[in-house]
Amino acid sequence: MLPSTIQTLTLFLTSGGVLLSLYVSASLSYLLYSDILLKFSPTKRTAPTMSLECVNVSNAQAVNHSATKEMTFLLPEPEWTYPRLSCQGSTFQKALLISPHRFGETRGNSAPLIIREPFVACGPKECRHFALTHYAAQPGGYYNGTRKDRNKLRHLISVKLGKIPTVENSIFHMAAWSGSACHDGREWTYIGVDGPDSDALIKIKYGEAYTDTYHSYAHNILRTQESACNCIGGDCYLMITDGSASGISKCRFLKIREGRIIKEIFPAGRVEHTEECTCGFASNKTIECACRDNSYTAKRPFVKLNVETDTAEIRLMCTETYLDTPRPDDGSITGPCESNGDKGLGGIKGGFVHQRMASKIGRWYSRTMSKTERMGMELYVKYDGDPWTDSDALAPSGVMVSIKEPGWYSFGFEIKDKKCDVPCIGIEMVHDGGKETWHSAATAIYCLMGSGQLLWDTVTGVDMAL
């Protein structure tokens, strides 16, 4: 059934026993599309009508001049969100830099928080910049030891995109050392994971209410994707994994509705190790994810999740452009698409976002410029085809971060314009102070806009020695 909005305006006019009811209906059409060819499918709905009974004015004996008038507006609930066609454009350009530690000499409530694992998620009215903080600011006496991934102080925080994540600006959503968030069109869903490594717990918050939990199933650092979950028609899909960082770690997907888990999805296929997926809608039927294998290969595990059947399958990307770090030379892995190759130990979360067009689909990816270090970040694109079977190289589309600058985790998200969605990729640029000083990040954002070539890279402008 297509979503529709019915507004009912009830007008009560009481005068000498006269009651009038007026029903007004309005319908909205939503944009739907198939896996490859996206089409408009308008529909109309008509509200039930009621005849109006007229009063014989000649029989009225008196008029009550003190008659009361009451008007009640029954406004519609916000609609669930659905993926739409992408806004027009053929290249990404530098959109925004959030570099909190350029303001590192500021103290008090305006001090920048120590953060890592930033990502962006968008609702119909705003985008929010999320991150995991160590509950410390810079400058300050508590920033030593902030290189550690998991502790009892870490929290999922957010600010409106464009704001600096300072003590004053940030909303603290929940205790968490791994996180995600997404907006279903009506409300935010927040995901936080914390607890001991052997028995971590996923916590779900819907709006302001804490609504559900999910326990560790492999008892080895249950964790989530560190980027936005994905919602369609009120259902939100979240990737989780549990298992060794250097061995087996099998992922699952949780289907969440209004903050409560309604289904678990167990992917088939190549499931040995899948973590830190970056996911988005290829269509209104399919979620696709480019993930990290930290144990066996420098190829990215690629997930296809059918939201109509709630089934998922994982295979390795077949392209000769290997997207993980560290990685071997492009094209050096021989054998079938499922061959792991070498240099598979270790990895990094990768950026991935869809460009949905009426006649084709673009898949945009990011990877570090260095094959061995988390330095630099380049953008790549492939139009149409199947990531599971296409062995061709991806097309380079520009340098977002030079090899002289840090390029750590990256992620994808989409900004909701009035009639279309704007695909974007974000890059975590980490200030790595080691164990003896603060360890935090800036965020660079590139979005689809206009044509031509990607023109300029991003620098953090931060000198940790200052």
UniProtKB/Swiss-Prot annotation:
Record region (Involved in apical transport and lipid raft association): 13-35
Glycosylation sites: N56, N64, N144, N284
Alphabetized GO MF terms: exo-alpha-sialidase activity; metal ion binding
Activity control, per UniProt: Inhibited by the neuraminidase inhibitors zanamivir (Relenza) and oseltamivir (Tamiflu). These drugs interfere with the release of progeny virus from infected cells and are effective against all influenza strains. Resistance to neuraminidase inhibitors is quite rare.
Family the entry assigns: Belongs to the glycosyl hydrolase 34 family.
Residues the entry annotates as binding substrate: R116, R150, E275, E276, R292, R374
Span of the signal peptide: none
Region annotation (Head of neuraminidase) ranges: 89-466
Cystine bridges: C87-C420, C122-C127, C182-C229, C231-C236, C277-C291, C279-C289, C318-C337, C424-C447
GO cellular component: a single term: virion membrane
General remark: The influenza B genome consist of 8 RNA segments. Genetic variation of hemagglutinin and/or neuraminidase genes results in the emergence of new influenza strains. The mechanism of variation can be the result of point mutations or the result of genetic reassortment between segments of two different strains.
Organism annotation: Influenza B virus (strain B/Maryland/1959)
Active site: D149, Y409
Post-translational changes noted in the entry: N-glycosylated.
Main subcellular location: virion
Residues annotated as binding Ca(2+): D293, D324
Chain ranges on the Virion surface side, renumbered to this chain: 35-466
Subunit structure: Homotetramer.
Intravirion side: 1-11
Spans annotated as Hypervariable stalk region: 38-86
Ion transport among keywords: no
Descriptive protein name: Neuraminidase
GO terms of biological process kind: carbohydrate metabolic process; viral budding from plasma membrane
Keywords: Calcium, Disulfide bond, Glycoprotein, Glycosidase, Host cell membrane, Host membrane, Hydrolase, Membrane, Metal-binding, Signal-anchor, Transmembrane, Transmembrane helix, Virion
Location in the cell: Virion membrane; Host apical cell membrane
Topology class, membrane: Single-pass type II membrane protein
